[in-house]
Amino acid sequence: MPTINQLVRNGRKRATKKTTTPALKGAPQKRGVCVRVYTTTPKKPNSALRKVARVRLTTGIEVTAYIPGIGHNLQEHSVVLVRGGRVKDLPGVRYHIVRGTLDTLGVSDRKQGRSKYGTKRPK
């Protein structure tokens, strides 16, 4: 416990919040190029084949990003937009690919929650 005099001299240090998305360098999104598109299995108790992509960002950093939604058109050399947001059951996946921008198509036949999957309004 510091004395009043010590607090007057130095004050309290503010606890700095550690960023969860260091590769974005403080930006909301970053553009990148897919290096490898593949599937992985989630950790216990879940079971699936989750679609992920290894993306080289414009900052030069390579990250693993999750491809949300059912079906996708991504392949090697696709240009994608990457946002923050981890996938809880995939260790090491701390980023999401934004659907409906750049080379990523929106999810087809989607009626609800369309904005999250880059789908246009059905006629």
Curated annotation (Swiss-Prot):
Keyword Ion transport: no
Positions bearing 3-methylthioaspartic acid: D89
Region (Disordered), start-end ranges: 9-28
Annotated Low complexity bias: 18-27
Domain of life: Bacteria
GO CC annotation terms, alphabetical: small ribosomal subunit
A Pfam family this chain is assigned to: Ribosom_S12_S23
Keywords: Methylation, Ribonucleoprotein, Ribosomal protein, RNA-binding, rRNA-binding, tRNA-binding
Alphabetized GO MF terms: rRNA binding; structural constituent of ribosome; tRNA binding
Signal peptide: none
BP-aspect Gene Ontology terms: translation
NCBIfam families linked to this entry: rpsL_bact
Function: With S4 and S5 plays an important role in translational accuracy. Interacts with and stabilizes bases of the 16S rRNA that are involved in tRNA selection in the A site and with the mRNA backbone. Located at the interface of the 30S and 50S subunits, it traverses the body of the 30S subunit contacting proteins on the other side and probably holding the rRNA structure together. The combined cluster of proteins S8, S12 and S17 appears to hold together the shoulder and platform of the 30S subunit.
Protein family per UniProt: Belongs to the universal ribosomal protein uS12 family.
Subunit structure: Part of the 30S ribosomal subunit. Contacts proteins S8 and S17. May interact with IF1 in the 30S initiation complex.
Designated name of the protein: Small ribosomal subunit protein uS12
Species this protein is from: Desulfosudis oleivorans (strain DSM 6200 / JCM 39069 / Hxd3)
Gene name as annotated: rpsL
